[in-house]
């Protein structure tokens, strides 16, 4: 379900400006998705060259965030958008902030992997790689949903985070077992726990982007809402009922 309609303005230039910003967001999203995928690969394969490329590439992500942010400020000042147009611009501003933070996670994963892990830690990395791929797919899907402002898909992705949380909890239990069985693994396990938590937070970031889609489509703030209450709000019902 595509909820975008950018061909309604009297000013064709306004349409072009909105479309340009949306295109930049999707470019940034694709860049961050690739950064994250490469970071997971670099960590799992202990590929130092790939890790260094990811670290270097984070600068480009940061530059894109600044450029899109400035474009949004200009369009607000120049066009004074209202209603759905304003919601779209605000959703974009918030979404690029989430994408920038996901890019930071990719950077941190690579820096940590370069400093702390070696081939002897491979068993610790297998589960992290699986969790990482799960969040990469989640990011891919939420970017697709954002491009179309697809409410139904955003709801599905929002709920997918529960599976990411469950996978993360399983990894924590596994890593705690490693530490109890061999105290010599404590430093590397603590590093793996840090990476696991960072990856799990990507799922939360994707949930936040889903909330911005809800906000654009429904015109209502869905932050800090979950479970049955979320279902009622999306259906247009009073959550107190």
UniProtKB/Swiss-Prot annotation:
Pfam families noted in UniProt: PhoU
Presence of the UniProt keyword rRNA-binding in the record: no
Record carries keyword Cytoplasm: yes
Subcellular localization(s) per the UniProt record: Cytoplasm
BP GO terms, sorted: intracellular phosphate ion homeostasis; negative regulation of gene expression; negative regulation of phosphate metabolic process; negative regulation of phosphate transmembrane transport; phosphate ion transport
Primary localization class, coarse: cytoplasm
Gene Ontology CC terms: cytoplasm
Keywords recorded for this protein, A-Z: Cytoplasm, Phosphate transport, Transport
GO molecular function, one term: protein homodimerization activity
Family indicated by similarity: Belongs to the PhoU family.
Subunit structure: Homodimer.
UniProt cross-references to NCBIfam families, sorted A to Z: phoU_full, PRK11115.1
Job of this protein: Part of the phosphate (Pho) regulon, which plays a key role in phosphate homeostasis. Encoded together with proteins of the phosphate-specific transport (Pst) system in the polycistronic pstSCAB-phoU operon. PhoU is essential for the repression of the Pho regulon at high phosphate conditions. In this role, it may bind, possibly as a chaperone, to PhoR, PhoB or a PhoR-PhoB complex to promote dephosphorylation of phospho-PhoB, or inhibit formation of the PhoR-PhoB transitory complex.
Protein name from the UniProt record: Phosphate-specific transport system accessory protein PhoU
Organism: Enterobacter cloacae
Highest classification ranks of the organism: Bacteria, Pseudomonadati, Pseudomonadota, Gammaproteobacteria, Enterobacterales
Name of the encoding gene: phoU
